[in-house]
């Protein structure tokens, strides 16, 4: 008679899982409501929540309240310094380059207090949920074997070295800037000392420290999930929270597409195509298709668990409905990249998951699959009949016409300029966060980017090719940690393609599609996208490492 292995016994959710899960849920709920990486205090608040999640995954209950006291002290010191800086100053503010007049976007109080107050909220939340009096004995062993953990630390150390060894300083006022050379150690990686935060006239400040803040919050969320050892059911619950948040945001964003006014205090540019709180529809489309991929993975998870009862209904149908709705809203953002991704998810990834992931259970889940397909077709026909895809069709036609006329896409000149910039410093790069300050010299040489007088028409702040821009900023040496993380991901991708991981295969494909999309657009500099991406990567790792196939093999005959 079969005897169940010990790891096949369902145990209660631990208090540490509750603590880290609560902070992660808060980050996922708040993620889409900040204007990406533009508003400094939103980025700082995300990083604060991420740090509190790591402490919740590592420390005991007493440690949470001790760290809460640290965050209170930090907030008091920051408030005192801000008040002192504002008193009688011609250019008030805690941080450099603060404009004389404030809006919500660049308010010095928000910027000074966002990180400690967000960390305080996360720590108090962890203190309420956590019941373990001592530090976790498993956190360090888990992180010690985590390639993304070490890759993130190595990348942060490299960027810090660049910033400490600055070859120049950016002096900026009212959209004009120049780089003042500085003495530095020539044989070490060098960076550019530039504004950390934005003012009213130019919301495009960026440097290495700000880049680390943008990447650091989502990275800390992933580290916390791994250190706490969150099991699949907790990650499934977080995925449901993210999908539900995205669905609510999709409806609200579709109904709120202003062409003027402000978002978090920043004036909406005249040429911007806003969707909700996203200044760019492409970013909204990416956020929605990431959650559509999560919903597809949830449908696969619940379908496998339902087995031959799938035709009777269940959460898999709700998840499939959510995936279709989010995919349609992603298309309604008029993002060509989002349309291609959701099309591949539906027409390629979903069938591949059925035939590859359910190889041993295909007969059991077939009735449930047909029920989901019929429901999906009905949803697509119903929503497609009332939705207006005319703007999307016009945009696609315009891009196709420009490609036929020029023989290339409209962002090819930016890629060419970025490539020349990267080749001038291929080993160490120009410094993290330096692209917008250095690249205009190279952009000005591209005929397609010039005006009628042969001058640069508009300065591009990003290359719209994230991997090429990263190469230009950090060089080949700075890409080594990224390559290590990609090797780790390759192993997870290979594991996801094995039989018994139907819920992991959509996540792996989603990450591949996101990486390809980042080769043609600006994606990896926005915290809402990276926060969801951190959950996708953590879920992929858990689904491949905590497989049902492996647990079934552990059952003794």
Q: Which functions belong to the PLM regions below?
A:
Residues 167-203, 261-275, 394-410, 416, ...:
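Interfacial juxtamembrane loops and adjacent helix segments
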